[in-house]
Amino acid sequence: HETSVQWLESYQAPGEVKIEAQATADNLAMLVEGNRVYNTDSESVARIAHVDIVETEAGETITARGQLTGQLLADRVVMATENVTNVEAGMYSLYSKNRRGLPLEIAASEGYTETTETEITWDAVLDGVTTLAEASGLGFKVLFNPETGVETYKVYRGIDRSDEDSPDYVGYFGQDVGNIQNITLTTGATNYKNVAVVAGAGEGADRAVRIVSLGNVSGEVRREMFG
């Protein structure tokens, strides 16, 4: 029953979601503040934080907005000063020492060796984790297991797809790579010119004129400009 789902994930931030749907009884029951929405493609889950119900001539619609559950880290404060050297360990430690009842489990360490000399003091855990991620190039996310209902906070190293010489390079947009959903192609020749009439100094018959064209064009397809 949804009319639009916008699911934005970020490498070094929780990410957000916006769902627009008809205000059916089922949608009104499901899209309420605090409920979770699961993305089967990325194994991530969002928590609904804000709901709008609008009545129009076409009927009632509901718009639900939320953040991916990594946003829960913003609800805890680092209750001391943390001096971080190993980034992965620090990103886990900031959460584990200040968890205080949050439901996110902690993934096993991958043994990443990125280091820093960073002091985190009395920030939100999310701010501290983001600082370490941006300083090191590591990212973080929360994965959801639909069989157990467990959400797991994980630090990970992303794949650089910007290097054209790398086999992981993905440098184009297309439906096959999932970064374009709808394609609109527009053609037209409103301002198109393919022949330039270039005049030099002088007056009348003494003025030098040259014609430059894109190919051998004539008739209606010949479009001249003066310059």
Describe the residue ranges of each PLM region.
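Juxtamembrane "anchor/assembly" segments of surface/extracellular structural proteins
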Residues: H1-A29, Q67-Q71, V221-G227
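Short, ordered beta-strand-loop transition motifs
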Residues: W7-G15, V51-I62, L143-G149
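Terminal peptide-recognition signature
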Residues: I19, L132, V198
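Structured loops at beta-to-helix junctions and adjacent beta-edge loops in soluble globular domains
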Residues: Q22, V51, Q67-T69, Y156-G158, ...
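Short coil-to-beta transition motif at edge beta-strands of beta-rich domains
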Residues: N27-Y38
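Short beta-strand and beta-hairpin "edge-sheet" elements
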Residues: V37-G66, K141, G178
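Charged- and aromatic-enriched interaction segments used to assemble
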Residues: T61, R65-A189
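Acidic, small/polar-enriched beta strand-loop surface segments
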Residues: R161-G227
